Amino acid sequence: MTSLKVFVIYDTKHGNTKLSAENILQGISDVRGIETSFGYANEIEVERVADYDAIILGAPNHMGRPSRTMKKFVDRLANVDLKTKYVAVFGTYAGKMRPVDRAVRKLEIMVQEKLPNLNLISPGLSVRVNGITGPIVEGELPKCYDFGRKIANILEKQ
């Protein structure tokens, strides 16, 4: 049996989204039989992503929207012949606590519009940070790990 392959791709300005991505990656990696890759959106050749079973995209909230870097990455992905079947998104935000930040919702919509062949396998995760530069609010990182485990468990059943 071939193992599942998941690529966690993030953009970050102050390191908070990267830290969130690392915890999501750990949650996925702790499920046996799933091969993972991890990288910064600006450094990834989009063609590398084509053969993964799932991609997880994470971006900081910039003025209520996903970062420009992540938007450009999704635009580039739209021009690749993806074998990928599944996608999930997450993001970091500052401000009042809310179940799902609006930038995460916008990233979900963007992915569904530009990559219509991908199935959204989980509602997005919003990770709250203190102020613009962080750090991540206490209690948020375990949510990242749990998000990774949840995605891995869903993928195992597909």
Please report, for each region that a protein language model flagged, where it lies by residue.
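FMN-binding flavodoxin-like domain, especially the glycine-rich phosphate-binding loop
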Residues: 2-4, 16-19, 27-31, 37-41, ...
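A short, well-ordered alpha-helical element
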Residues: 43-45
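Aromatic-flanked redox-active Cys/Sec active sites in thiol-based oxidoreductases
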Residues: 10-14
